């Protein structure tokens, strides 16, 4: 027998703060999207969880990792460079992200950037379990990527995203 759907319980509106991204390796900035896609795929075959995106300067940039210190990120990048997996790299610091800048400019600044980043992925196909712009995203993979590109470390799966978020009453939307 099938049970009737249960209503989603309302969680108390306790304020939550998402974890911030740490230091990230950027291993490419390309004029051609195909080059970024190839590097991303190569990095992902190494289990690095890379993604690419189109930056405001028009270049397609490839990023991966989430390190506690710049030294850890640099050491990992140098190892990958020595192994011939990446060539040039740049370490993205937490203060470079919109989430940190939003402390100065306010939450509307962050919201606007999240929407702009998500719009940059319009046209990328839906793929169940997908987490990349080259093959496709599922809903939680897209949201995770958009948040990470803005400096907020959101879990991969929708259940974790739900738990990381803050309940908002329908009337407050």
Model-found features: residue ranges?
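Extracytoplasmic/secreted envelope proteins and their assembly/folding machinery
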Residues: 33-40, 74-77, 111-119, 140-144
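Surface-exposed patches in mature extracellular/periplasmic domains of secreted proteins
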Residues: 48-53, 87-92, 126-134, 154-160
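N-terminal Sec signal peptide cleavage junction
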Residues: 2-5
